[in-house]
Every structure is written in structure tokens, then in C-alpha cells.
Amino acid sequence: MQFTSQTDYWNSVAKSKEFTTNLNYGLIAPFIKPESNILDYGCGYGRTLNEFHEKGFHYLTGFDYAAEMISSGKKRFPFLNLKVCQDNKMDIPSDSTDLVLLFAVLTCIIDNEKQQELMNEIQRVLKPGGLIYLNDFLLNNDERNLVRYEIGFEKYGTYGVFELTEGAILRHHDPLRMKELTKNFIPVVDEKTLFQTMNGHTSNGIIFIGRKR
């Protein structure tokens, strides 16, 4: 059985989870202007868009499929344009966006086809030469993760998938998988890094900024 989104889980933690794959503004700053249209897919409660707002950007739109996350964001940051979306679709015209943010979103989508569907939608909304800035989690080789990867592989058929005790089903990625997902973008930044997870562990990660081909 494949789980491609877990709306109930993310709605349930909307008021308690703090996300940890943070914006590195210095990496993206050389490529954007104050008038840039910036879209955050999987925006949660809008924390990253608010950082851009504080730096003087105003054309900011966020999408998330968890309605409680959007509701929480509208209360915290009422000046942001936050919307609920479904099925990897964004109510945005084609070729209209300068920058799409995708922060720790692919980790929440365990199905290859659904991941690619989202990347195709991002390609659609980006202007020619527009940018994607994504960060996400890569495979780890410590015993705790290796055990849960094996359990997840037996249950879901994809190595790197695992369950959290509180109900989330997540995925850590092989670097080759990330290259496949980003093949339609010209790399501007492609870095390996370490991220803290929502539950306080450390994980291998990737930061990728690419230009639409």
C-alpha cells in the first residue's frame, strides 16, 4: 500500500512541529530581485516566506495540502498569501514564477510517480530560466536508520522509506534519485550538508538550486 500524502498527520501537528531545513539566503540572494515572484510549495505555516517578507520581498505565495498548516500560517503571518492545494497542483498560471521553494517536501512523498508529478508542476509554473531551490534528506548509514530502511523496504518497496511512531511515513533519498528528479534543471548550487530533523536527530541532506532548462 502506497501513501503519497498524509494530510491528517500534518494537520494534527500544525501547532506543534517546527521545521528545521532552513533557508540559506546567501545562496539564493544573487539570483533574485525585490520584484521576483516567489512560490513556496509545502510552505507549512509560512516560516520561509516570512523570511523573504522581512527582507523586502512582497510577491510571495505559499501552497500546502494541510489546511491546518495554512490556517496556522494565516494567523501568524496574515500578510502572506497562503493557499491549500491538492494532488500536486498549484492554482498559478504557467511560466509565471521566478523562484519555487521546495523545502523538505520530497521526503513527505514516498511514491516515485507522485514526486515526478510535482517536479513537472514546478517546471510548468516557472518562467523560462526560473529557479528551483530545494533542500531535502539523503540516506544515512547509522544503525537506527538502516534498520528502519529495511523495515520500510519490506513494507513499501522503496529503500529509504520509514515510519515515525507518531504516524508519519517519510523517505530519505539516494543522491542518484535526487539527480533524476532535478535533471531538467541546470545546477547552480548542488551541495551535500547535514540537517537536524523535526525530532532532533541529524541527517545527511542536500541543497540544490537549479535553473529551468
Roles of regions detected by a PLM:
Residues 1-36, 41-89, 133-213:
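Class I (Rossmann-like) S-adenosyl-L-methionine-dependent methyltransferase catalytic domain
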Residues 24, 114-115:
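Residues at alpha-helix caps and immediate loop-helix transition turns in enzyme cores, especially N-
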Residues 90-94:
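Short amphipathic alpha-helix with an adjacent loop that forms part of the alpha/beta core around
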Residues 101:
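A conserved beta-strand element that flanks and buttresses the S-adenosyl-L-methionine
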Residues 104-108:
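Short catalytic micro-motifs in class I SAM-dependent methyltransferases
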Residues 111-113, 145:
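Conserved catalytic-core motifs of eukaryotic protein kinase domains, centered on the activation segment
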